[in-house]
Amino acid sequence: MNYNVLLSDQVQVAGAIDPDAYTAATYTTGWISMATYNRIMAIVMAGTLGSSATLDAKLEKATDGSGTGAADITSKAITQLTQAGTDSDKQAIINCRSDELGGAFTHVRLSMTVGTATSDAGAIVLGALARFEPATDAT
């Protein structure tokens, strides 16, 4: 390990869903090329969840940056956060390696769904182990 390398040269912001009060709907990051990173980590952040609200998040894959052939990535979703389950102000993480996409899939994005009631939430996707360093932030 090289202790002279900045952590920000090894881990970059690859995508984000800006923190906000979101109505019941689905929100996504842009498509992220896994040709850039060996791994990504999506961090989903729940703020104050509205009455009876739910928060779901998952990773999706596609064959290009426009979302062609979009599909869910197996086992790449959080356990649903709920207001009833006292999950306000909690975080959840989804990890993904480039070799987990399979087939001709080359891109990923994070999809976050707020259900039932307006809720505070946000997410960030970090790209790590860039194939060419130092990588730069996508956002």
Which sequence ranges carry the predicted segments?
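A short beta-strand element within beta-rich, extracytoplasmic domains
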Residues: 38-48, 110-112
